[in-house]
């Protein structure tokens, strides 16, 4: 019983802490401005960050 509770707590915590990003396609960038148009095409939302020369697209809402 105790092991099942800990496993359930671990699963819930992991799903909460996962980032809300989409990144099926690798988009190279130098600045966040380089990510706005490709992310708008990919997700419908221009919210993005350039991290380690790769765009990270975020969903709206």
From Swiss-Prot:
Keyword Protein biosynthesis assigned: no
GO MF entries: ion channel inhibitor activity; potassium channel regulator activity; toxin activity
Pfam families documented for this protein: Toxin_2
Tissue-level expression: Expressed by the venom gland.
InterPro entries according to UniProt: Scorpion_toxin-like_sf, Scorpion_toxinS_K_inh
Disulfide bonds: 29-50, 35-55, 39-57, 45-60
First and last residue of the signal peptide: 1-23
Main location: secreted
Cysteine amide sites (modified residues): 60
Keywords of this entry: Amidation, Disulfide bond, Ion channel impairing toxin, Neurotoxin, Potassium channel impairing toxin, Secreted, Signal, Toxin
SUPFAM superfamilies per UniProt: Scorpion toxin-like
Domain of life from the UniProt record: Eukaryota
GO cellular component entries: extracellular region
Location of the protein in the cell: Secreted
Domain comment, as recorded: Has the structural arrangement of an alpha-helix connected to antiparallel beta-sheets by disulfide bonds (CS-alpha/beta).
Family statement: Belongs to the short scorpion toxin superfamily. Potassium channel inhibitor family. Alpha-KTx 06 subfamily.
Function recorded in the entry: Blocker of voltage-gated potassium channels.
Name of the protein this chain belongs to: Potassium channel toxin alpha-KTx 6.8
């Amino acid at each position: 019983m105790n092991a099942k509770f800990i496993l359930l707590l671990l699963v819930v915590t992991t799903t909460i802490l996962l980032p809300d990003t989409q990144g099926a396609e690798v988009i190279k960038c130098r600045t966040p401005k380089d990510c706005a148009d490709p992310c708008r095409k990919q997700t419908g939302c221009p919210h993005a960050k350039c991290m380690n020369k790769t765009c990270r697209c975020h969903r709206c809402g």
